[in-house]
């Protein structure tokens, strides 16, 4: 990068599971033709590797070795295309979407050793024309200099129902009470962890999506994008 050139602009969307951040991040990146960082994919890929190589959460030394050698690849990072995720040559695009992988990813992501290992990898997604990043600590830790930050939240029952419907639509038979219990446990873990807890950045736009449609949330976010003049740089290279 030219020393005089400003870093690529970043829009961050943080929030708990089921708040709608992933759906809106996809739509915004697709609209602007920017890169996308779905940080949850990275943690799920690490969880898959832990299960595949039989490295338990309690094995700090083994986990450190795994994080140093494992090769995670995310292809098609420009929106409009579905990402293909591989780990050490294995296509894990579908495997990481299982509830088991998600549960392990949630627990692994609470470990400082894991979050520190993926920090630079996440920052490397920052490329022109721009990046939309969604996760739990995108605006607070990974990209504190983001030009526009959002924090989505919603009632836990509504978030659980959204997740339940998503899994049902994918043909996965689950119970709503189990989904809500798991979601609330993840919330507790994400909010109380010692490193990068889930919370809004001080300068974030906070949106409660409980009673809002996807289109309403998308329109609200795009209004802020236009107000910052970011839509005007959508086609910059």
Curated annotation (Swiss-Prot):
ATP binds at residues 15-23. InterPro entries: Cytidylate_kin, Cytidylate_kinase_dom, P-loop_NTPase. CDD domains: CMPK. It is found in: Cytoplasm. GO terms for cellular component: cytosol. GO terms for biological process: nucleobase-containing small molecule interconversion; pyrimidine nucleotide metabolic process. Keywords: ATP-binding, Cytoplasm, Kinase, Nucleotide-binding, Transferase. Its EC number is 2.7.4.25. GO terms for molecular function: (d)CMP kinase activity; ATP binding; CMP kinase activity; dCMP kinase activity. SUPFAM superfamilies: P-loop containing nucleoside triphosphate hydrolases. It catalyses: CMP + ATP = CDP + ADP; dCMP + ATP = dCDP + ADP. It holds the Pfam family Cytidylate_kin. Belongs to the cytidylate kinase family. Type 1 subfamily. This is Cytidylate kinase. It comes from Coxiella burnetii (strain RSA 493 / Nine Mile phase I). The gene is cmk.
